[in-house]
């Protein structure tokens, strides 16, 4: 890079800098190539960072509130990232005010609304059209072996499925909170399974009550052992929960993530009757700027 681009750092899905999932945000990535953006993401070391540029023609949205957004992990570009979307929306909300935003992502168009809530900003993203699919028994067995999870440790009420709401995630439900807490997996073996199935994370879930869940997301394909708060997976899980009849057509779910990592986060998932898309919301806070490039 020949010019300096300010790299903002925000944590998403928590108002506490020590909680949630940190993301890099570059509000003006014009002039940056793919290698530049990957280098910034790798230098930061966060699970993903977001890079904004001018919107494509015909995207819609209010002038100055529509953008092209690309997401990079330390290892590769990803089609969509929920927590970096929330972080970006909070950063924009602080600069251009609350209201509606429109993001053009590789996964599709993602509307985001930023609102004020008790003095804090809250961002709500609406996913692209979600869907779920079965996973082959052999692929499931390989994923469980990589996790060192015996099949009897799964919750039979929540069957394994691959869920998509911008990125693909394998949903596996633990029968107990203890099972969820005990996570020591084979990084390379799980990464190989995930690459073969084109998965972004494996979403490990434990159901505390009707609408409250605890989740963990291994992310070896991004070069990260575990993601502290995964908005894209939360959206995919909302679609999964509705499709298998776990929750009604209209529901609000609370997902607790990051607790076992010491970075607690809260993700709110909203399902609306008559709308197959999923809304994922959370707060965020700035961690401080740094510079990238020379």
What are these regions (language model features)?
Residues 1-80, 86-294:
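Active-site proximal loop and beta-alpha junction motif in alpha/beta enzyme cores
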């Amino acid at each position: 890079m020949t010019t300096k681009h300010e790299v903002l750092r925000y944590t998403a899905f928590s108002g506490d800098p020590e909680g949630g999932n940190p993301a890099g945000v570059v509000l003006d990535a014009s002039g940056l190539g793919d290698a530049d953006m990957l280098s910034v993401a790798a230098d930061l070391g966060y699970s993903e960072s977001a890079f904004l540029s001018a919107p494509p023609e015909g995207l819609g949205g209010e002038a100055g509130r529509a953008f092209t957004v690309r997401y990079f992990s330390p290892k590769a570009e990803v089609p969509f990232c929920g927590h970096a979307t929330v972080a970006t929306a909070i950063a924009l909300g602080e600069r251009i005010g609350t209201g509606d935003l429109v993001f053009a992502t590789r996964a599709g168009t993602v509307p985001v609304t930023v609102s004020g809530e008790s003095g804090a900003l809250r961002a709500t993203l609406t996913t692209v059209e979600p869907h779920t699919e079965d996973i082959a028994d052999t692929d499931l067995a390989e994923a469980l072996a990589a996790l060192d999870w015996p099949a009897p440790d799964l919750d039979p009420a929540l069957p394994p499925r691959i869920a998509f709401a911008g990125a693909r995630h394998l949903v596996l439900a633990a029968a107990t909170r203890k099972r969820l807490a005990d996570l020591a997996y084979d990084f390379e073996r799980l990464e190989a399974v995930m690459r073969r199935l084109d998965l972004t994370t494996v979403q490990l879930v434990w159901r505390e009550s009707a609408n409250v869940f605890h989740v963990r997301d291994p992310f070896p394909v991004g070069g990260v052992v575990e993601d502290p708060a995964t908005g894209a997976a939360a959206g995919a899980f909302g679609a999964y929960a509705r499709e298998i009849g776990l929750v009604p057509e209209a529901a609000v779910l609370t997902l607790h993530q990051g607790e076992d990592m010491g970075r607690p986060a809260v993700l709110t998932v909203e399902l609306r009757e008559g709308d197959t898309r999923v809304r994922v919301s959370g707060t965020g806070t700035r961690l401080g700027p740094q510079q990238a490039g020379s």
